[in-house]
Amino acid sequence: LTCLPQVLDTVGPQHVILLGHSDGASISAIYAGSIEDHRLWGVILIAPHFFTEPFGLAAIAKARTDFEQADLRDRLGKYHQHVDNCFRGWNDSWLHPDFREWNVSDCLDYIRVPVLAIQGHDDQYGSMAQINEVTDRCYAPVDMLALTDCRHAPYLDQPQATLDGVSDFCRRLADINV
């Protein structure tokens, strides 16, 4: 809750729609539910995590095996200068025994801006229960976009549907806030 406000203050936007994917979606939701920021018009949560699920942890354990024994390290290396630090920071955190009880769902109770929650039905790291948690707990209006034939990266598996959903949501927020 200290870094994101500093980034926003430095960049200096007057109006913000936070968009986060995976752990970034969790960060966006935590911010929206914890900080009263009048610049915030809405939040877009793509494949968010609010609690751990056994099958998701199993997929993260499989990712560790793929990183150590298959080609995942090479594939990620195209996107990350320090691929080992990046992967281990994520993977080791999620697989730490203390993390099994991790739950940040309470932040959803305090979100007071519109939310778009996007989830793939075939997400290997999180089930539809993640965005159902959003619709069940958020006080603010929530749009849900549940995509078939879609895993953890809707913008890759269903790019047009994801872009259309995000564009429509942003357009509607602009219309009501201008």
Label the predicted regions.
Residues L1-V16:
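Conserved acidic catalytic loop of the alpha/beta-hydrolase fold
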Residues Q14-E53:
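Conserved hydrolase catalytic core segment
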Residues G56-Q81:
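A catalytic-pocket lid/entrance helix-loop region that shapes and gates access to the active site
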Residues W90-C107:
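Active-site nucleophile elbow and catalytic-triad environment of alpha/beta-hydrolase enzymes
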Residues I111, A117-Q119:
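Short beta-strand/loop motif that positions the catalytic acidic residue
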Residues V113, S127-D136:
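Short alpha-helix in the alpha/beta-hydrolase fold that links the catalytic acid
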Residues D122-G126:
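Acidic catalytic loop of the alpha/beta-hydrolase fold
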Residues V142-D143, T148-V178:
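Catalytic active-site module of serine/aspartate enzymes centered on a nucleophile-bearing elbow/loop
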